[in-house]
Regions:
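Bacterial N-terminal signal peptides that target proteins for export
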Residues: 1-10
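Bacterial N-terminal signal peptides
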Residues: 9-19
Length: 424
């Protein structure tokens, strides 16, 4: 009787994960059936990949990782595959750097990600397990190179989970952590659901962005918990000095998320393809370096428009609100001259922020455009910011009602060159 109950429980569990994921055939490929040990010592790469390939051959289905630690080099997911990580399962990236082959990724030299899919559709990663990139040795290498003082001494690091030119993607329930670099990257992909996941990395781990949609569209991110070393979300669409062509990121909703350590919710700075129709609502920031941040500069910009934020609360966030066409600096010099408008000049406009509360900030922030491309149509409603320093506005058109900035030092709202401000 107990055996029958266990079989019924397993069947119900698998039925539930199928219902949650994009439609797949009902094949179940348990990686243990293909030789996986799950002991944290044996490399299970071949077994996991064999399970993926077998499921694909059957028309799709679930690749199942039951409780255990599966040490692995990179694996590649295929169409109609649900990689399901049971509670207590860990897919652990190999710490052997030689296991990550060199590839051209995002037009640049890179290393293959631990989990990736390319030109695939109906792909999901679900469950209550963990994907761990074992990034510690990569971070140490990155710090060593940075501290060497040798300019241009970059060495590529792998991302953790990448969807490249994919459609109909779901990530649900899992924890993603300790990536060598960016953690979850949809690249030129479409129709993506990211819900109820955690993305984690130590606060000072370099470049460990949580979620970085890159030239991707129709994305729904909800109940994301991010506690990382860089951007909690960074929406991107094209690198600095991009030769083009670049595609925008657009039609993205971000709701009911919590961000702890990290650099906040960002659009940019690599935004050479532009970004439109992005909405964030009910976001809680606690101790991030930044809150809302839209950033670009003269060598990586494009049209960034129809952006809205609603019901945002922040506690002990260093910079509450940054909208800057002068990244990485927040404020330009007083004598900043106009420059010729090019294909990569940023154009920020039609940005709305409703109901934002921030307490304990070091700075209320800045809204800073370029003299040749002033920011237009920023509308603020019901902003209540308490900070050591106020909000600086230059080369920008800002209007709104119910805006209260309390600054312990200096002006609450400082208007500099090119500021057109109508706040009540």
């Amino acid at each position: 009787m107990r055996s029958s109950s266990l079989r019924l429980s397993a069947a119900l569990s698998l039925t539930a994960c199928l219902a949650a994921a994009p439609a797949h055939a009902e094949a179940v490929c348990n990686v243990h059936a293909y030789g996986a040990k799950g002991d944290g010592v044996t490399k299970d790469t071949q077994a996991i990949q064999a399970a993926v390939d077998a499921c694909e051959h059957k028309g799709g289905g679930i690749v199942l990782l039951s409780a255990g630690t599966y040490l692995s080099a990179p694996i590649v997911l295929k169409s109609n595959i649900n990689l399901h990580l049971d509670k207590g399962s860990i897919l652990l990236g190999s710490s052997d750097h030689a296991d990550y082959p060199a590839i051209t990724e995002f037009r640049d030299p890179g290393l293959r990600s631990l989990v990736s899919a390319t030109n695939a559709h109906n792909v999901s990663i679900t469950g209550e397990g963990v994907i761990d990139g074992a990034g510690q040795t990569w971070w140490e290498m990155a710090r060593s190179i940075k501290n060497s003082g040798v300019m241009g001494s970059e060495h590529p690091r792998p991302r953790l989970v990448v969807f490249d030119h994919c459609k109909h993607i779901l990530l649900e329930g899992i924890t993603i952590q300790n990536s060598p670099m960016w953690q979850l990257v949809p690249y030129y992909s479409d129709d993506i659901d990211i819900r109820n996941i955690k993305v984690l990395a130590p606060a000072h781990s370099p470049n460990t962005d949580a979620v970085d949609p890159f030239s991707s569209s129709n994305i729904r991110i909800t109940h994301l918990y991010a506690d990382v070393g860089d951007d909690d979300i960074a929406i991107k669409s094209g690198p600095a000095n991009s030769p083009g062509p670049d595609s925008p990121s657009r039609n993205i909703t971000i709701t009911d998320c919590t961000f702890l350590h990290g650099h906040g919710l960002s659009i940019g700075s690599e935004i050479a393809g532009g970004a439109q129709n992005i909405h964030a609502e009910r976001i809680h920031f606690d101790g991030t370096d930044n809150g809302i941040r839209i950033k670009a500069n003269r060598d990586r910009g494009n049209d960034v428009s129809h952006i809205s934020f609603r019901d945002i609360d922040m506690k002990d966030v260093k910079n509450a609100l940054i909208i800057s066409e002068f990244y990485p600096k927040i404020l330009p010099p007083d004598d900043l001259a106009s420059a010729p408008v090019t294909r990569l000049t940023p154009h920020f406009h039609d940005i709305t922020i409703d109901n934002l509360t921030a307490v304990g900030s070091a700075s209320a922030g800045a809204i800073v455009g370029l003299p040749e491309a002033p920011i237009a149509g920023v509308v603020l409603h019901n902003l209540h910011i308490s900070a050591a320093r106020g909000l600086t506005i230059s080369n920008a058109e800002v209007s709104g009602t119910g805006v209260q900035v309390q600054a312990a030092e200096g002006e609450p709202i400082a208007k500099q060159a090119g500021a057109r401000v109508n706040l009540q």
